[in-house]
């Protein structure tokens, strides 16, 4: 679907990394976009108010409804007028489903699924950075589409694959190759990781991301989730998806075709590029991000993934092959473990170990009906996975 020349846009997770960079892209193209609504968790109320004032939005929502009075006060302080303030998860879902031309979903976590579904059902084009929507509730998400090609992937890897797939038909695809920077601990062995601190893990060598995604990138769980997402978004089985470590983060992913040709998308690491394409596809915008400088000597390297040191990708592959419910448990247990690590309640190696232990506990009960019947069933399973993760964490 071609986006209208002056598109209405709603941004979910506007104060996070994806949201702030999305607004930066939009600010450079005021003739193309009108931001009508912003939603955020509630941790950065002043920033949300400033964004609402700058973009003259009609509605601002916070997941944490106890922050509504603070947001109202901050909006007044920022000089924002006529902004309707709403609070609670239902208000964010309602905003997502209000019928904007484009909804950019930059929410972190599976709480982003219901807003994604609402946006699709309302006919909006969904610029999706919330990979958990696909990982935890894939078929619930896809069945909400009211037309083909309603989802524009915003993750840099999936945007790269999406662009590269234009070079051939689906039948001509031999494999997808997802690239990984390797994170801050590339080259480390498992024994070296026992005493890693949150401060160390939050220092990513190439990307500027939120804390949960940054930790996931360091454990390579993020790459595992991306393999799941790529398989489901592009209908390619997991055995035809490879992962390669590319420390320079210039090649964002590749598609190998049956004739031996490999097509990639390459650019300096800057999330504004996939965000911009997610907002405007199939058209491209000017003045988005820097291109590669081909006048300068450069070396791009690729190396195999060390599955022994970073078992998260193999664990994700196992869950992808098992069922949608396995991938939902993987995601929920991981979110719980990452938060515990950030709060210094769980050692670094305990993150993936906890996730595997929860999956081992729940494996038998997950092997009935592999698909969720509705979001409530998914939510209940995730709650159980989080509870079991907490039990294991508290025993550390």
Curated annotation (Swiss-Prot):
List of residues binding 1-deoxy-D-xylulose 5-phosphate: 131, 156-157, 181, 204, 217, 222-223, 226
Lineage, highest ranks first: Bacteria, Bacillati, Actinomycetota, Actinomycetes, Bifidobacteriales
Binding sites annotated in the UniProt record for Mn(2+): 155, 157, 226
Gene Ontology molecular function: any one: manganese ion binding
Cofactor: Mg(2+); Mn(2+)
Record PANTHER family: 1-DEOXY-D-XYLULOSE 5-PHOSPHATE REDUCTOISOMERASE, 1-DEOXY-D-XYLULOSE 5-PHOSPHATE REDUCTOISOMERASE, CHLOROPLASTIC
Keyword vocabulary terms for this entry: Isoprene biosynthesis, Manganese, Metal-binding, NADP, Oxidoreductase
Pathway(s) of this molecule: Isoprenoid biosynthesis; isopentenyl diphosphate biosynthesis via DXP pathway; isopentenyl diphosphate from 1-deoxy-D-xylulose 5-phosphate: step 1/6
Protein family (similarity comment): Belongs to the DXR family.
Pfam families: DXP_redisom_C, DXP_reductoisom, DXPR_C
Top enzyme category: oxidoreductase
Species assigned in the record: Bifidobacterium longum (strain DJO10A)
Positions of NADPH binding: 15-18, 41, 130, 132, 210
Gene3D superfamilies in the cross-refs: 1.10.1740.10, NAD(P)-binding Rossmann-like Domain (3.40.50.720)
Protein encoded by which gene: dxr
Purpose of the protein: Catalyzes the NADPH-dependent rearrangement and reduction of 1-deoxy-D-xylulose-5-phosphate (DXP) to 2-C-methyl-D-erythritol 4-phosphate (MEP).
EC annotation from Swiss-Prot or TrEMBL: 1.1.1.267
SUPFAM superfamilies: 1-deoxy-D-xylulose-5-phosphate reductoisomerase, C-terminal domain, Glyceraldehyde-3-phosphate dehydrogenase-like, C-terminal domain, NAD(P)-binding Rossmann-fold domains
Protein name (database record): 1-deoxy-D-xylulose 5-phosphate reductoisomerase
Reactions it catalyzes: 2-C-methyl-D-erythritol 4-phosphate + NADP(+) = 1-deoxy-D-xylulose 5-phosphate + NADPH + H(+)
GO BP field: isopentenyl diphosphate biosynthetic process, methylerythritol 4-phosphate pathway involved in terpenoid biosynthetic process
């Amino acid at each position: 679907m071609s986006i209208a020349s002056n598109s209405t846009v709603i941004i979910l997770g506007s104060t996070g990394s994806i949201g702030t960079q999305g607004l930066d892209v939009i600010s450079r193209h005021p003739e193309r976009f009108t931001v009508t609504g912003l939603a955020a968790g509630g941790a950065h109320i002043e920033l949300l108010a400033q964004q609402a004032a700058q973009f003259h939005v009609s509605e601002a929502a916070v997941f944490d409804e106890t922050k509504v009075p603070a947001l109202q006060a901050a909006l007044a302080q920022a000089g924002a007028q006529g902004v309707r303030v709403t609070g609670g998860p239902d208000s964010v879902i309602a905003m997502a489903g209000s019928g904007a031309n484009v909804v950019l979903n930059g929410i972190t976590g599976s709480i982003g699924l219901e807003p994604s579904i609402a946006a699709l059902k309302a006919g909006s084009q969904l610029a999706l950075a919330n990979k958990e929507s696909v990982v935890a509730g894939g078929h619930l998400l896809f069945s909400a589409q009211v037309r083909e090609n309603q989802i524009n992937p915003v993750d840099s890897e999936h945007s790269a694959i999406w662009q590269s797939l234009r070079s051939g038909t689906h039948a001509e695809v031999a494999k997808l190759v997802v690239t990984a920077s390797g994170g801050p601990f590339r080259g480390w062995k498992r024994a070296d990781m026992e005493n890693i601190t949150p401060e160390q893990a939050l220092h990513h060598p190439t990307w500027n991301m939120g804390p949960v995604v940054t930790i996931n990138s360091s454990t390579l769980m993020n790459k595992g989730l991306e393999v799941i997402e790529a398989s489901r978004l592009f209908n390619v089985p997991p055995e035809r998806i490879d992962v390669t470590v590319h420390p320079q983060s210039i090649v964002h992913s590749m598609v190998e075709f049956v004739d031996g040709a490999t097509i990639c998308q390459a650019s300096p690491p800057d999330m504004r590029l996939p965000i911009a394409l997610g907002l405007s596809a199939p058209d491209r915008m000017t003045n988005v991000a820097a291109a590669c400088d081909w006048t300068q000597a450069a070396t791009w390297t690729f190396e195999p993934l060390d599955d022994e040191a970073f078992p998260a990708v193999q664990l994700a592959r196992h869950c992808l092959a098992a069922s949608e419910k396995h991938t939902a448990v993987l995601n929920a247990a991981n979110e719980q473990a990452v938060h515990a690590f950030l709060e210094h309640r769980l050692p670094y190696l305990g993150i993936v170990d906890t996730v595997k232990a929860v999956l081992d506990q729940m494996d038998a009960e997950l092997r009935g009906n592999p698909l969720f019947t509705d979001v409530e069933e998914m939510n209940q399973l995730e709650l159980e996975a989080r509870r079991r993760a907490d039990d294991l964490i508290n025993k550390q």
